[in-house]
């Protein structure tokens, strides 16, 4: 286990980072406009092979809400390791592992990849998932 002094500094750092990420998430959502990007799918219409397709819209996704969710997940992760899971977090750090951060990265990076794909023009549901 890290020393009590190191554990205290890590807790303080995680609480600070979590607070900043939470404030960022709230600000992004509060200042958001109604900008959203579509999610669509193309289905064959008619006989296979003739090249006739029907475009179906599944709705749209708010870019600001995606970015806000990204920051909110980071805040939750920081608060989790600073609070209820701190002992487990410190024990894992002592073994040079950080599974909480990897879980947060897995979730938040998926959201960010989705958002970046949409911003660059990808709207097909098959490509987005």
Predicted regions and their residues:
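Structural signature of hydrophobic alpha-helical transmembrane segments
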Residues: 65-69, 124-129
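Hydrophobic alpha-helical transmembrane segments of integral membrane proteins
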Residues: 97-120
């Amino acid at each position: 286990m890290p020393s009590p002094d190191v554990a205290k500094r890590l807790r303080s750092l995680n609480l600070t980072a979590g607070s900043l990420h939470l404030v960022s998430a709230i600000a992004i959502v509060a200042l958001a406009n109604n900008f959203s990007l579509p999610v669509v799918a193309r289905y064959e219409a008619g006989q296979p092979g003739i090249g006739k397709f029907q475009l179906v819209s599944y709705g749209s996704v708010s870019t600001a809400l995606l970015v806000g969710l990204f920051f909110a997940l980071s805040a939750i992760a920081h608060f989790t390791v600073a609070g209820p899971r701190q002992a487990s977090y410190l024990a894992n750090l002592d073994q040079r592992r950080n599974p909480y951060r990897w879980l947060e990265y897995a979730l938040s990076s998926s959201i960010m990849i989705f958002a970046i794909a949409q911003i660059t023009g990808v709207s097909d549901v098959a490509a987005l998932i």
